[in-house]
Amino acid sequence: MIPRLMCTQHPDATVKVTANEEVDEALVAYTAYGCDEVMIDYEGKTTPYSQPKDITVKAYEAGLPLGEKFFLTPRMPNPRLEEFERSMLTLEAAILANYFSVKLMGRQAIRWIVLPMVTDIETLGLVYRMLLHKTEAYIKETGVKLEPPELIPLIEDAIAQLKADELISGLLKQMAQQPQYIRLFLGKSDSAVRHGHLASALAIVATLSKMRSVEKSLGIKIYPILGMGSPPFRGGINNPSLSHLETIQYVGYYTVTVQSAVRYDTSYDEYIKVRETILNACCLPSREINLPELEEIITKASSTYKSVVVKFADRIVQMARLIPGTRDRISWTVYGRNITAEDRVVNMPRAIVYTSAWYAMGLPPTFLDAPTVVELAKSDKLDLVLKALPSLRREWEYDAQFYDPQVASRYTSEDFVKVVNEMLDYLGINLRANGTYLSLLRMNRNESNILAMGKYRKFLG
């Protein structure tokens, strides 16, 4: 059984959830939210190493069929980007949880482990071998029959996603025997931070389009997972106003992340609608996409986006320091994201804080692609993009309700705001922030003000 709904521990809600509360939260995800998979997050996060075992034991006591109908899937730190010992301790925690689940229930609670920020085959090979070695050691010393968890590569960079076939092929070569399938995780958020909304959205659509031919060439079934949240910049698939469109735009998925904001910042009825929309569009064939033309646009859009962001990097960093943390994550100043443009490398916050910071500056981050959109419109190529991304215009229209040129000018520049307005004129979008949200935007920034805007939007970032 391959899970369809992956409940996550993302800090995109305005509600604070501590690591201690995440054990009970996992059981609620299974029973109340209908998720069949819970992702325990160790990437840039101080999650206790006992959490997988604690959830396993509590699920057993509650009579939940963990490892049969419900699954636990840790996301480990990437040993290339974080401390090596944290990566290894996460693997240890996963195998130890399986030891207990086999003893208690006769089956493994953890069938998969997610490796994030995958860009190279060497790290995939290292983690794969360590999983084998650690599992073999437990079998030898305890006599308990265990299977090593399978590795899920999480690719979170637009350029790397376009080379997903090479990464999958490289992983298969590391394996002693060919598996029946691979779950491929495509992340929207970090890709958007690095390359912008336009490039990251096109890259995922293009990658999904290629999967059928990749399956044929490699002789293996691929089950794509979409890592997306509520704001359009982060995929929009959890958004009650957009999910019915995003599930069509990103068709070809098998599993979707159900992040914190859609569970805690929307009504339960809204959540159910999002859940059913995701499930109803699951597992359909991906769309045919004209890849060569799109790859050229992806490269150009990414380059233009980066040149915009580095101009306002200091403002983003200042605002990011005001964004409240709603999970026990490591500070983005320690584990952040780098953007390189114009011979300058800038350290940016992780995706949720980054997204929230742009909204707090009166400029939804999807609008950072305005120079590219205007150029595409003038060169009669915008229709090509809108065909590949049929939800795009609706996403911009949705985000326009959180846009205030006056506030955006104060944090960015009048010249850039003019380009944003020109883009919206091309698209015939006249909506702007008004009423309560506009009042909040024009107040002084502090944590309470940012949380209030997040509650209004129904997501922090």
Swiss-Prot record:
The keyword Nucleotide-binding does not apply. One of its GO terms (biological process) is tricarboxylic acid cycle. It comes from the Archaea. Keywords: Carbon dioxide fixation, Lyase, Magnesium. Its cofactor is Mg(2+). GO terms for molecular function: magnesium ion binding; phosphoenolpyruvate carboxylase activity. Its EC number is 4.1.1.31. It catalyses: oxaloacetate + phosphate = phosphoenolpyruvate + hydrogencarbonate. HAMAP family: PEPcase_type2. Homotetramer. Belongs to the PEPCase type 2 family. Catalyzes the irreversible beta-carboxylation of phosphoenolpyruvate (PEP) to form oxaloacetate (OAA), a four-carbon dicarboxylic acid source for the tricarboxylic acid cycle. This is Phosphoenolpyruvate carboxylase. It comes from Pyrobaculum islandicum (strain DSM 4184 / JCM 9189 / GEO3).
